Amino acid sequence: MPAFKSRIESALAARKAQGLNRSMNVVFAGNQSILEHEGRRYINFSSNDYLGLANDQALVRAWQQGLSVYGSGSGASPMVTGFSAAHSNLEAALTEWLGFERAILFGSGFSANQALLFTLLEKSDVLIQDRLNHASLMEAGALSTAKMKRFKHNDIKHLETLFTNEGNHLVVTEGVFSMDGDCAPLKDIAEVARLRNAWLAVDDAHGIGVLGEAGGGSCELANVKPEILVVTFGKAFGMSGAAILCDQATGDFLTQFARHHVYSTAMPPAQAYALTHAVSMIQEQSWRREKLVELNEVYQTNLSDLDGFVETDTPIKPFVIGESELALQVANACRQNGIWVTAIRPPTVPKGTSRLRITLTANHSTEQVKTLSIALKQALGAL
């Protein structure tokens, strides 16, 4: 049998037998509150476009204007000729807004997280991560030369037991956890890190733009400034890409040694141009965050009495079903009633905690959230 074929077929068969096979659906307007699939319209509660910017016409025009000025692609890595005024302006906007000296741009949050850990850590270092951190962080930690330890989710007492008297320590947590929608106790984590002379890195992919009075995210809300902040542009910014924010020396270090940065083509300058507009929109259009608060109250009022309901202060609303088959059954029943929700199953979440990952956006109406509630209750009642 040709190389790798047996392994590939075996893995695919096992995934299918476990009922965990995944597939991609071709949808139209997946970045809007109403999407279309195979000729039918659904209310979309699966998008990470929390502030509703992905299809905002002002942002679309900004990208189009960027295209007219800069063309389509950057043409090179940022260390060659791929770094334009648009990239520089985006970095400046981010640092001024979030209060850091440097911002280093990346093509995705996954690459930013991996670049950070692979570049910063050495064999003598200790990496301490929340056990529910994103796969990009866990993979990079496992593959790095540093010793990785994991603390129980949001458990400060357990975190305190993992420090040693040797080596540099880096504590890494998400600001908002993508599958549970809960926030890290950043003030407590930051204090523990400070007392242990450790650095703190926060991946705020799901908090930036959504939390805080000016949309500064989890750190603004907690009044905490970590040594390193990772923000991504694929959620509240309505686009894609990411940035690592840090002090000047760390920024220079990453610019020189982060291979994901040095050896990747820079993001299109038109994208950077539009992202700079998104930064302004996030700060100035507080009504988008206010809308999320309103929708959260409607969601909670209508569903908090049901088993599986999880209370969160973020737009991420996990509804825990338990078994994978039942989660799929509920998701499919909701779709029959015109509601698009996604069942999240192992290995993304632990076995026995399969769930619907429901997300609210500023483009939803209160009536749409009420319609979701009715459909979900009907689906659960049919189990």
UniProtKB/Swiss-Prot annotation:
**In its UniProt record, which GO terms are filed under biological process?**
biotin biosynthetic process
Q: What is this protein called?
A: 8-amino-7-oxononanoate synthase
Query: From which organism does this entry originate?
Result: Vibrio parahaemolyticus serotype O3:K6 (strain RIMD 2210633)
Positions carrying N6-(pyridoxal phosphate)lysine are K235
According to its UniProt entry, what is the function of this protein? Catalyzes the decarboxylative condensation of pimeloyl-[acyl-carrier protein] and L-alanine to produce 8-amino-7-oxononanoate (AON), [acyl-carrier protein], and carbon dioxide.
Pfam families hit by this protein: Aminotran_1_2
Q: Which UniProt keywords apply?
A: Biotin biosynthesis, Pyridoxal phosphate, Transferase
Known catalytic reactions = 6-carboxyhexanoyl-[ACP] + L-alanine + H(+) = (8S)-8-amino-7-oxononanoate + holo-[ACP] + CO2
By its UniProt entry, which PANTHER family does this protein fall under? 8-AMINO-7-OXONONANOATE SYNTHASE, CLASS II AMINOTRANSFERASE/8-AMINO-7-OXONONANOATE SYNTHASE
Q: Name one GO molecular function term.
A: 8-amino-7-oxononanoate synthase activity
The highest taxon in the source lineage is Bacteria
| Organismal lineage | Bacteria, Pseudomonadati, Pseudomonadota, Gammaproteobacteria, Vibrionales
Q: Which NCBIfam families does this entry report, sorted A to Z?
A: bioF (TIGR00858)
Q: Name the pathway.
A: Cofactor biosynthesis; biotin biosynthesis
The record's HAMAP family line, in alphabetical order, gives: BioF_aminotrans_2 (MF_01693)
Which positions in this protein are listed as binding substrate? R22, H134, T348
Q: Where does pyridoxal 5'-phosphate bind?
A: G109, F110, S178, H206, T232
Question: What is the gene called?
Answer: bioF
Assembly and partners are described as: Homodimer.
Per the similarity annotation, which family is this?
Answer: Belongs to the class-II pyridoxal-phosphate-dependent aminotransferase family. BioF subfamily.
User: Does this UniProt record's set of keywords contain Transferase?
Assistant: yes
